[in-house]
């Protein structure tokens, strides 16, 4: 299925539209199934979205939230995605949400895979919404071009939910949801700001080569609808 592209005049407008779409998806899940699940990404880009979403009128006590990936640092580290979520999303009424971090204190990401996979498997699935980011190198979650084991992590039919990743250029070992885990969702949302990322997005759609631009594995599949939120 084609990627739906939504155009916005500012990143703040895109963040609000994304928050509205996620709140609608979570509300529909709560009404239909009594529980809802959301996967979010870290980095600096989603902060505005987090601030919009945390104000949504939801029964947060029935919402489960986890991460698409994590740098292998404790949540007190400034580079922690879990720390970012706690600081910017799990505030106010949203503190009632159930948050499942990926970092569990194990010595390495690989050492955490078995325990964290069991924890992930207990969440409401398929995930009701997945919010991804994308780097200018085409990575999404922590699925980086050139990383060892990338082909296995990008197998849409692979059995693993998680992959340990050592990015070739980015700091910190990572634990990432695999493509198969990300595709175990009802809808994938991809906010992209800036001309550079829009150009990478266009190349990924045109070439569909996930080993060069891993985000293409998300954009060029037909199992799960994808919406891109494009802003300057």
Where are these regions (language model features)?
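A glycine- and small-aliphatic-rich helix-loop capping segment at beta-alpha/alpha-beta transitions
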Residues: 52-60, 83-86, 145-154, 206
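ATP/nucleoside-binding phosphotransfer catalytic cores, i.e., glycine-rich phosphate-binding loops
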Residues: 2, 180, 186-232
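N-terminal glycine-/serine-/threonine-rich phosphate-binding loop
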Residues: 1-38
């Amino acid at each position: 299925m084609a990627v739906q592209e939504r155009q916005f005049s500012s990143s703040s407008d895109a963040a609000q539209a994304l928050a509205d779409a996620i709140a609608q998806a979570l509300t529909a899940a709560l009404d239909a199934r009594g529980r809802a699940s959301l996967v979010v990404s870290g980095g600096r880009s989603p902060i505005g979205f987090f601030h919009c979403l945390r104000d949504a009128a939801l029964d947060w006590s029935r919402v489960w939230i986890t991460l698409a990936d994590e740098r292998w640092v404790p949540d007190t580290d400034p580079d922690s995605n879990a720390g970012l979520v706690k600081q910017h999303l799990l505030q106010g009424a949203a503190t009632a949400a159930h948050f499942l971090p990926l970092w569990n204190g194990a010595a390495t990401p690989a050492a955490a895979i078995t325990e964290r996979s069991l924890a992930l498997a207990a969440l409401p699935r398929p995930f009701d919404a997945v919010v991804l980011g994308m780097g200018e190198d085409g990575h999404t979650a922590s699925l980086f071009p050139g990383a060892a084991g990338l082909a296995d992590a990008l197998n849409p039919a692979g059995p693993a939910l998680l992959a340990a990743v050592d990015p070739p250029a980015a700091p910190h070992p990572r634990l990432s949801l695999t493509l198969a885990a990300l595709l175990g969702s009802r809808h994938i949302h991809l906010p992209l700001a800036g001309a550079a990322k829009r150009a990478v997005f266009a190349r990924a759609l045109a070439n569909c080569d996930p080993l060069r631009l891993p985000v293409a594995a998300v954009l060029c599949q037909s199992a799960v609808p994808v919406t891109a939120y494009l802003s300057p």
